[in-house]
Amino acid sequence: MNQLRKIIESAFEKKEYISNNNIDSTVNNAVREIMDRLDNGTLRISEKINGTWITHQWLKKAIMLAFHTMDNQLITWGGGVFFDKFPMKFSGWDHTRFENKKLRIIPPATVRYGAYIADNTVIMPSYINLGAYIDVGTMIDTWATVGSCAQIGKYVHLSGGVGIGGVLEPIQTNPTIIEDNCFIGSRSEIVEGVIVEKGAVISMGVFIGQSTKIYDRASGNIYYGRVPAGSVVIPGSLPSKDGRVNTYCAVIVKTVDSKTKNKVKINNLLRDI
């Protein structure tokens, strides 16, 4: 692993001079190995280590190098013809492979090579970009978008039209993270490396970026960049200092209780394949 990282870090420093015509075979092999391992989940962009999310920026650099070094190719998919450097993730998969992974992929769901999809997931017609990580038992609902390198936990439900922000550049920026057992309501947007902690419920139409105030009405605390575990969040507003206008915020109205869980619970029958 350290050797792979050294190869990528060194090559990235001179990425402007690297192309598919002059790439060193050692670098090329390293980039392709990393893309394969992101695709199969043995590497991931960000992971929780000792309670803290750690982003492996060198893996993002490997993806950027892949854009420099991989050739565009014709992609025939869904009755159309496309032209890109990265194939569709499920190109070449057969019945047995889908069945063994216990996946349901509903057309025209689009998943790019380099995104990891864990077992027992349901992917409705949606878009999942490269470098993303979708963990076990999650449902990505219709027209949801999971951006590059976003990390989605176990048993998450991304409702219809949800947008989860992606990030490749700037390199030092962290991905958006949705932890285990979260529910993200329809048409909500979580972007800019925000972390939604375990078990949180986001109502429909909530927009959260790094500068969004997340107001806890019980305590009066204001959070930025993270939604505390178990929070139930709705859209709201707060008055300006002079009281002349109200500006948008997200409001924590309570913590998750049994009533909330029943409202957002995904019927296991929908997952039974």
UniProtKB/Swiss-Prot annotation:
Xref: InterPro entries: DapD_Trfase_Hexpep_rpt_fam (IPR005664), Hexapep (IPR001451), Hexapep_transf_CS (IPR018357), THP_succinylTrfase_dom1 (IPR023180), THP_succinylTrfase_N_sf (IPR037133), Trimer_LpxA-like_sf (IPR011004)
Compartment annotation: Cytoplasm
Keywords recorded for this protein, A-Z: Acyltransferase, Amino-acid biosynthesis, Cytoplasm, Diaminopimelate biosynthesis, Lysine biosynthesis, Repeat, Transferase
Enzyme Commission (EC) number: 2.3.1.117
Binding site for substrate: R104, D141
Enzyme class: transferase
Family, per entry: Belongs to the transferase hexapeptide repeat family.
The protein, known as: 2,3,4,5-tetrahydropyridine-2,6-dicarboxylate N-succinyltransferase
